[in-house]
Swiss-Prot record:
Known role: This is one of the proteins that bind and probably mediate the attachment of the 5S RNA into the large ribosomal subunit, where it forms part of the central protuberance.
Descriptive protein name: Large ribosomal subunit protein uL18
Any one biological process term the GO annotation gives: translation
Family: Belongs to the universal ribosomal protein uL18 family.
Origin species: Latilactobacillus sakei subsp. sakei (strain 23K)
Lineage: Bacteria, Bacillati, Bacillota, Bacilli, Lactobacillales
Annotated region (Disordered), positions in chain: 1-20
Domain of life from the UniProt record: Bacteria
Keyword vocabulary terms for this entry: Ribonucleoprotein, Ribosomal protein, RNA-binding, rRNA-binding
Signal peptide range: none
Pfam families documented for this protein: Ribosomal_L18p
Biased composition (Basic residues): 10-20
GO cellular component terms, A-Z: cytosolic large ribosomal subunit
Length: 119
């Protein structure tokens, strides 16, 4: 019987493969993105110390719940960039979490770049 591969399992394989190659430091933290069906989450991570430096998601009160998911991802990208710059982090490494660079992930990344993050 032919079975379809589970999309989330293949994404997790991609993510672990990429995570072996990139990691965040205190000088250049990792901007990690997680996408669920309803929400999107972004956080700056210092992998050496194992600490989250800044985070934002669609569950935050600053993000408006109206609009499409792409618009919400843009708001989350702008918010995490503002919090990162406020904490003193401008240069980051973007970790798309095994997702394709398209749609919500690309919208979050471009909004973060427009609000002061460099990657």
């Amino acid at each position: 019987m032919i079975s379809k591969p589970d999309k989330n399992k293949t994404r997790q394989k991609r993510h672990t493969r990429v995570r072996g190659k990139i990691s965040g430091t205190a000088d250049c933290p990792r901007l990690n993105v997680f996408r669920s069906n309803k929400n999107i989450y972004a956080q700056l991570i210092d992998d050496v110390a194992g600490v989250t430096l800044a985070s934002a998601s669609t569950l935050d009160k600053e993000v408006k719940v109206e609009g499409t998911k792409v618009e919400q991802a843009q708001q989350v990208g702008a918010l995490v960039a503002q919090r990162a710059v406020k904490a003193g982090h401008k240069v980051v490494v973007f970790d798309r979490g095994g997702y394709l660079y398209h749609g919500r992930i690309a919208a979050l990344a471009t909004a973060a770049r427009e609000n002061g993050l460099e990657f």
